[in-house]
Each structure stands twice: as structure tokens, then as C-alpha cells.
A protein has these predicted regions:
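Structured C-terminal cap/extension of enzyme domains
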Residues: 2-173
Length: 173
């Protein structure tokens, strides 16, 4: 389990981060996530990938005098889940049917995954960085030729060539 989804949910700039700040400006999104996990029955250990002193101090503060979530706070978490679900995303299931027909051998589900992360978590810069490290230049979204072979194979009827253009605008410039 990754309660902060590799740090994406802890982003103060995301819709969830802004909502949590409106509920309690003194508590970080990461703290909310860790308190939720620690309040679950049967949890014995929680690992946190921390990248700076602030995160270490925030985690220590969260667990120093730990209090499980209250019913009201579970309502706050439920609202966070709804905020994430309400974000319009490309409904890709990563079935990979689209890749078989792609003459450019694009990793279409991977590109869509990165694109969706920018929509869901307000993580454009980090997604762009990881995209450029994980997707080789010769198979990036900008290499889509718009043939739509992929769209014929997609059981979700996603307009993949349009999404590749949008992803290219976000990541390949």
C-alpha cells in the first residue's frame, strides 16, 4: 500500500491537497494519509520515503502523539476519495490491445498513465520528468502518426490519437 501514492497524494497543489489545507491548514496531506493507514486494523508498520528534513519532522509530528482518525475525519478522507474520482481521466484499463496495431510501437498505456497523473495529482513537472526517463524518445507521444489503428483495437473506445497529441503537448515540448 502506498498511502501517498509515491508522494503524489501529498502534493499541496492537488485538489485533494487544497481541500485538506482548507480543513486544517496545520496538517499536511501526508499526515492525513499516514493517520488513515495507521488507523486501519492490523497495521503494524508504516514505511515512509522521505526526501527532506521537513518530511522527517512532519512524520515524527504525526506519530509522536498518534491519534486514530475520528468519524468526522473519516468523512474528510471519503471526500478526498470523491475528489480524486471526480477528476476526468482517460479511462484506459492498460489492456494493451492498442499496442499491437501501433506501427510506431508506442507504449500507449504508459503514456496515458503519465497523462492521467497530471490530471489527477497536479503533478505535471514530476510526471514529465519520469516520462522522459522511462519512455525512450523514439516511442514518445510525439511519434504518433495519427493512423488510428490503436483506436480500432481499444475496447474502451478511447480517441487515442487525440490523447497522444495532448500528451505530446504536456511532455514532449
Amino acid at each position: 500500500m502506498e498511502p501517498t501514492k509515491g508522494g503524489l497524494l501529498a502534493s499541496e497543489d492537488s485538489a485533494v491537497g487544497k481541500y485538506l489545507r482548507s480543513v486544517d491548514p496545520d496538517v499536511s496531506a501526508a499526515s492525513w494519509a499516514f493517520r488513515w493507514v495507521a488507523s486501519l486494523e492490523g497495521i503494524k508498520y508504516i514505511l515512509s520515503g522521505m526526501g527532506n528534513t521537513y518530511q522527517v519532522e512532519d512524520n515524527a509530528k504525526t506519530f509522536k502523539n498518534f491519534k486514530p482518525l475520528t468519524e468526522e475525519e473519516y468523512g474528510v478522507i471519503a471526500r478526498c476519495v470523491q475528489i480524486i474520482r471526480d477528476v476526468p481521466r482517460v479511462p484506459c484499463t492498460e489492456c494493451r490491445y492498442c499496442t499491437a496495431g501501433c506501427p510506431m510501437s508506442l507504449p500507449i498505456p504508459t503514456i496515458i498513465k503519465f497523462y492521467n497523473e497530471t490530471l489527477t495529482y497536479a503533478a505535471e513537472e514530476s510526471s514529465k520528468y519520469v516520462y522522459k526517463r522511462r519512455v525512450p524518445a523514439d516511442v514518445r507521444a510525439s511519434n504518433c502518426i495519427g493512423c488510428k489503428n490503436c483506436e480500432e483495437q481499444c475496447p474502451q473506445h478511447i480517441k487515442i490519437s487525440d490523447i497522444m497529441k495532448l500528451a505530446s503537448e504536456k511532455f514532449d515540448n
